[in-house]
Amino acid sequence: MSVPRVVHGASGETAQTPGMERKAAIDARSVGAQRVFMGRVTAPPHSNSGAHHHGESETAAFVVRGTVRVYFGEGFGEFVEARAGDFLFVPAHVPHVEVNPSPDEPMEVILARGPDNIVVNLPDAVDHLTERAMATSSGG
């Protein structure tokens, strides 16, 4: 019989992307979830993730603390910015880079993804973006 479950904190290991830390809360290992992943993402001030996408998984996120800027599109030339209290959606198969543009405030995001926490890192795609994203985040 299936029963509701409580997970205290997001501490489970899950797929990672350089520049940020993901911790699983709700997934197949913690509660036997088959069609949803929930977790917490944190990033230090003035940092960026590597380029990645989430395959067939869509991502919905809530910004708990700080600011997250998501670069996407041709040459990662476009971005959206979400602040504490905002919700964010990233469609399936969209390559992106997450940036914490703040020079002094960490970023914390709660995310839900389905059907699973698919992470496809794109290590060759971000070299040129890192310099541009960090320059943009510091006002340059």
Enumerate the predicted regions with their spans.
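A short, N-terminal "cap"/entry segment at the start of jelly-roll beta-barrel domains
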Residues: 1-35, 50-51, 124-140
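Conserved short histidine dyad/triad with adjacent acidic residue
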Residues: 22-24, 39-55, 92
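Short strand-connecting beta-turns/loops that link adjacent beta-strands
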Residues: 30-31, 56, 75, 103-104
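A short hydrophobic beta-strand segment most commonly corresponding to one strand
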Residues: 38-41, 60, 89, 104-122
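Residue-level recognition of conserved beta-strand positions in structured domain cores
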Residues: 40, 53, 72-74, 100, ...
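Conserved metal-binding segment of the jelly-roll/cupin
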Residues: 43-44, 82-102, 113-114
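A short beta-strand-loop-beta hairpin characteristic of the jelly-roll/cupin
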Residues: 48, 57-84
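A generic "binding-loop/recognition-motif" signal
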Residues: 56, 75, 94-95, 115
